[in-house]
A protein has these predicted regions:
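Mixed-charge interfacial surface used for oligomerization/domain docking
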Residues: 3, 11-19, 24-30, 86, ...
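A general secondary-structure boundary signal
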Residues: 3-5, 79
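N-terminal glycine-rich anion-binding loop in soluble enzyme alpha/beta folds
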Residues: 5-70
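Positions that flank functional sites
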Residues: 34, 93, 201
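Alpha-helix N-cap/helix-start motif at coil-to-helix transitions, marked by capping-box chemistry
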Residues: 42-45, 95, 126-127
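A short glycine/small-residue-enriched secondary-structure motif
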Residues: 45-52, 75, 80, 107
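Glycine-rich phosphate- or other oxyanion-binding loops that anchor nucleotides, phosphorylated ligands
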Residues: 56-92, 99, 103, 150
Length: 295
């Protein structure tokens, strides 16, 4: 049994089964749907299809990050068991949750001076963030010490690529994730914008693609261009989707066709309710390991 805990926020958008199997702990963000508050608990409080159907019908959503008090109570359960902690946060480019974790860390280190609490800004989101967590769990299982796993995360977090497209950027604009000008372009008939996450963990529109068929090809082209080893890529590949499984499956099929050396099949996950509050339904995101991201 490891002497430290690997932990993240629920916004890593893996399944409960995946977190449990890999022994990755998580703490939940929160969101409101039409003024009723829920935990972003991997679809347990509200099934994903119900959540996205409500959004499509016009329901309002508002998210709230984990606060310092919640982090303190969460971290303390591990410290009381004599465990050190490696916690990886949702990207500081789209959330202030890193600051909450750092406040809790400072308070707890005074009370538990013999324990280590290491915090990493993932500079990632959704299952791309989850892909990083999965690799950190591999290193822990190989017997790597806490500091070595932390160093790996800090040195390699920008090698997780995040590419995604949506048929509607309305929710991205409403949530402040992209500008109104970019959203207006994305709203033109037949246009499917292709975005990625830059080296500061921000969402950046990159291409304006006409038709969904072409954007599916283009997103896989980006994987070919940026993946570690190109078409010989032998790492894992994750996809997240918000109520558009058929589109996600089409991307996965093309990835599996063009990258025969993948480590297993493409894993398709749901975009969780925190990230989904800002994407709305209709987003497909592709995640893989590659060369370091740039602005």
């Amino acid at each position: 049994m490891s002497s430290y805990v690997i932990s993240c926020c629920s916004t890593a958008d893996l399944t409960e089964e995946h977190f449990s199997k890999r022994e990755i702990s998580y703490i939940c963000f929160h969101y409101k749907l039409n003024d009723t508050e829920y935990a972003d608990d991997l679809g347990k409080s509200m099934p994903f299809d119900q959540f996205y159907a409500a959004m499509a019908a016009g329901a309002s959503t508002k998210t709230s990050q984990v606060n310092a008090d919640e982090f303190e109570a969460y971290f303390e359960t591990f410290l009381q068991d004599g465990k050190d902690i490696l916690h990886v946060c949702l990207s500081s480019g789209i959330s202030g949750v890193l600051n909450s974790a750092m406040i809790a860390k400072a308070d707890l280190e005074e009370r538990y001076p013999e324990r280590k609490i290491l915090i990493v800004d993932s500079l990632g989101a959704s299952s791309g963030y989850g892909l990083l967590m999965d690799r950190l769990a591999d290193l822990r299982d190989e017997g790597k010490p806490l500091e070595e796993v932390y160093d790996f995360a800090m040195k390699n977090r920008l090698k997780v690529h995040h590419w995604f497209f949506s048929t509607d950027l309305t929710f991205y604009v409403r949530g402040g994730r992209i500008s109104k000008a970019s959203g207006a372009i994305g709203g033109l008939p037949g246009i499917c914008p292709l975005l990625n996450m830059d080296n500061e963990g921000r969402l950046i529109p990159r291409f304006k693609i006409r038709t969904k068929k072409k954007v599916i090809k283009k997103i896989v082209d980006q994987m070919e261009e940026n993946a570690e080893g190109g078409l010989s890529y032998s790492g894992k590949c994750y996809i997240s989707q918000s109520a558009c499984y058929d589109d996600a499956r089409a991307v996965a099929d093309l990835v599996e066709e063009r990258f025969p050396n993948l480590n297993g099949k493409v894993e398709i996950n749901n975009i969780g309710t925190t990230i989904g509050s800002h994407t709305g339904p209709g987003t497909v995101a592709l995640f893989f390991w590659g060369k370091e991201r740039v602005n």
